[in-house]
Design a protein with these regions (language model features):
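N-terminal small/polar-rich segments of proteins
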Residues: 1-94, 123-159
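Short N-terminal segments immediately surrounding and downstream of signal-peptide cleavage
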Residues: 23-25, 102, 113
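Short acidic, flexible loop segments centered on an aromatic residue
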Residues: 94-102
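Short beta-strand and strand-turn-strand segments in soluble, beta-rich domains
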Residues: 105-117
């Protein structure tokens, strides 16, 4: 309980004191921890004569849209892997980015359509869980060769 004190002045010169009690509460939520175990890796890609989209799905599969000769080359593309730990039964909500840019020797490459292989809102199971994040990479025609890198943020929030 907290004590509240209020001074009131009447029309005269008398000061009256009024004391009341009210309850103050606070809900402390258990901590949630998010750890990145491995990065989102598009692997090695050969750009084509036309723009294309290379997708690493959250389940680890890959796909290509748009054609133009875009293809993976001797690599093992993989989704990012994350670990969530905390008190079992805690409600959570994952937040993924809309889009990011990869920077390298040529023009920037856009990564978009991020997806996770778990429900974005959910309840933490006993022992926590791992989940994977995939996304699509837009590759322009004749993109300059080289290493392209960027950073994306995944947040775990309380709903």
């Amino acid at each position: 309980q907290a004590r509240v004190r209020l001074l009131l002045s009447t029309t005269g010169n008398t000061i009256q004191s009024v004391t009341g009690f009210l309850t103050v509460g606070c809900a402390l939520r258990p901590m949630l921890h998010l750890t990145n175990l491995s990065p989102l890796d598009f692997g090695s890609i050969l750009p084509g004569d036309a723009p294309g989209i290379f997708r690493v799905h959250a389940n680890g599969q890959t796909s290509i849209a748009g054609g133009g000769g875009l293809r993976a080359f001797r690599s093992a593309p993989a989704p990012a892997v994350f670990l969530v730990t905390g008190t079992s039964g805690t409600e959570y909500c994952l937040e993924l980015p809309q889009r990011i840019l990869l920077r390298g020797p040529g023009g920037n490459l856009e990564v978009h359509s991020f997806e996770a292989n778990v429900p974005l809102p959910g309840f933490l199971p006993k022992g926590g869980f791992t989940f994977q994040v995939g996304a699509s990479l837009a590759v322009p025609a004749h993109q300059a060769p080289g290493l392209y890198e960027g950073i994306f943020q995944v947040a775990i929030n309380y709903p």
